[in-house]
């Protein structure tokens, strides 16, 4: 079972009319714990109306960005997604578990390959992380 850490929200930005991007401040002493590979996700935990809620969200930035960001699409009647899109703001605190997941991309700098990714809807978020990683770390790939 993952250990959760309290992280402060750095910024909540409206990405579309139905989605926000949440950026977290990661204290320096937790940098190693929150290091991730492109394609991984984090689990967010909070209490809403007295009930503990956990949701997994893919990271949507490259590991080299030194940022921890997730995109959350508002889902009708989605308890956490509605909360995130309407109430969360900078300086709020959420409990966050370290990155997990096996849908990862490991770049090879000297490789030249053609990479194609398909995704729809909010499934684009891990692909965004992978695309950014390819562009930053595999300069010979397309």
Task: Identify the role of each PLM range.
Residues 82-142:
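FNR/FR-type flavoprotein reductase catalytic core
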Residues 2-92, 97, 113:
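Ferredoxin-reductase
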